[in-house]
Amino acid sequence: MLLSALLTSVGINLGLCFLFFTLYSILRKQPSNVTVYGPRLVKKDGKSQQSNEFNLERLLPTAGWVKRALEPTNDEILSNLGLDALVFIRVFVFSIRVFSFASVVGIFILLPVNYMGTEFEEFFDLPKKSMDNFSISNVNDGSNKLWIHFCAIYIFTAVVCSLLYYEHKYILTKRIAHLYSSKPQPQEFTVLVSGVPLVSGNSISETVENFFREYHSSSYLSHIVVHRTDKLKVLMNDAEKLYKKLTRVKSGSISRQKSRWGGFLGMFGNNVDVVDHYQKKLDKLEDDMRLKQSLLAGEEVPAAFVSFRTRHGAAIATNIQQGIDPTQWLTEAAPEPEDVHWPFFTASFVRRWISNVVVLVAFVALLILYIVPVVLVQGLANLHQLETWFPFLKGILNMKIVSQVITGYLPSLIFQLFLLIVPPIMLLLSSMQGFISHSQIEKSACIKLLIFTVWNSFFANVLSGSALYRVNVFLEPKTIPRVLAAAVPAQASFFVSYVVTSGWTGLSSEILRLVPLLWSFITKLFGKEDDKEFEVPSTPFCQEIPRILFFGLLGITYFFLSPLILPFLLVYYCLGYIIYRNQLLNVYAAKYETGGKFWPIVHSYTIFSLVLMHIIAVGLFGLKELPVASSLTIPLPVLTVLFSIYCQRRFLPNFKSYPTQCLVNKDKADEREQNMSEFYSELVVAYRDPALSASQDSRDISP
């Protein structure tokens, strides 16, 4: 790709970013858009009503939202938004620090060295130069200047590992501080017990109570046995829809038609009162629900949520084998009540096993299927390939502006459009695997997305057109470093364009929230929107973290190969830091907490990125006829993996569970609290299946 084509892509995306930011700064001030750009604040403070008086300032773009987004401290984010939100922000902070250092070294040291090479001698003006002139490919084979890249790799690895260690330690400190500062939470005192043995003459509930009163008498508080409630939930969903419809009719938020004709197609029969009609249907559904609830007593599942009086008691029950038979009385930490994925208990073990096999096959098929759009995208990036495929377009493709747009902007845009449907698919696949909580489903989807992006967004793009037809390259591990060293630098221009298209424009479209804005406009146009019923969107950690980490992988691997990508990445992370602070404060609301457990994923992926950079460096120094540097690079991935193992042993156990020291100290602090009895009363029913709680919604509506 020529530098002019890259500049065209950057110019288009800069224009889109400026347009989106301008529109956002105006639209966010309009009272009618408060549920689009501030739903979290509306739900939290109930401030959905704003003055409708005309104000000229509302029509002028301003940047005051940036200042407000940067005002909250880390401690304020931790206390108001939760630990997961803080970890999400710290991923941006970590990336900004890494690529600030990388940009200084890459732009002021490595880039001039690359540019002064003579491997690609081109006597053109700067805009007509190829991107290869700014990459390590332009450095002459065997040149001593390559030792500068060698030293940069070692220094960069040390800096990344140091920052990673510091961030690990910081987040762990905040995780402990969050435990000490927060109020007692049900999941801290509760354990999920599965594999409850069947005892003749006893129900599941009686068996659980007898066991824990016998062996955990000092700390056992209560338990709730899980029931099969899938059929009841169907009735609940129908009742909820009917209740909302009845509420809208009575409030006048939809058509105030209070009567309709009964009979066939509403043309015959008596005039029926709509409110009375819906109320009777709702009453009948509630009667059916109560009947179904009364029949659920015999549909117990051999699992229960067991609550304890102390966190320490719950931790002991979680980490110690309960019965002689290791397949019975299985215990694990309970998720938050709102985090429980209740369909997990409906499926049998065999059904979950089959689902896992189906998910694995579907995931592999998706990886293979997405090679097709990758090949298409790489064909667009290559004018010669396009002319081969479509010879009748040769005249159009030779036009300067057309060729620059097609090679510089279209490939990354089309690839981004293909990727839009991937996150929902990964969430769907993960939900079929039998996870007990929504947070586990999101973590699984996050890992799947990372694998997908590594394969389809990186390796498939890098190898397509050069080594994709040689699938056996992966069966010969010795050739992998050389193949990657030859293929990766050639795709630098595509990934720079991808960063500005998917990164810059993607972030600006995130803050504009175009789809929710259009949906809000359409519902208001047809009079169907009700401010009381809108839903605050959940924080998209599982979708955004893979994208952030993938850009990190690009920056790390191209640090010494093509450092021109580094400032574009730094701009992306700075924009992301500002935009997502704004979105977390105003738009998103976490429905449940994972306790910062996304951070170990960030750590592992960063280590993988470093090792991949080292493997490419080994092959590249070999190709560049510098065998000594290639050999001296080999210890680097080994040292990096050893560092990762140390970090996992040092920090990972504290992410899986809290240490006894912290739990006992927190339990002692709770003993001095006056409202623990009230908390215990709430804890007893905290894990009651929502389907077993009788709906009283219709009773609360006055005629």
From Swiss-Prot:
Compartments it resides in: Membrane
Database matches in Pfam families: PHM7_cyt, RSN1_7TM, RSN1_TM
Cytoplasmic side: 27-81, 166-355, 433-436, 513-540, 587-598, 656-703
Coiled-coil residues: 228-300
InterPro entries cross-referenced by the UniProt entry: Csc1-like, CSC1/OSCA1-like_7TM, CSC1/OSCA1-like_cyt, Csc1/OSCA1-like_N
The UniProt record lists the keyword Coiled coil: yes
Molecular functions (GO terms): calcium-activated cation channel activity; mechanosensitive monoatomic ion channel activity
Membrane topology listed for this record: Multi-pass membrane protein
Biological role stated in the UniProt entry: Acts as an osmosensitive calcium-permeable cation channel.
Protein name, UniProt field: Hyperosmolality-gated Ca2+ permeable channel 2.3
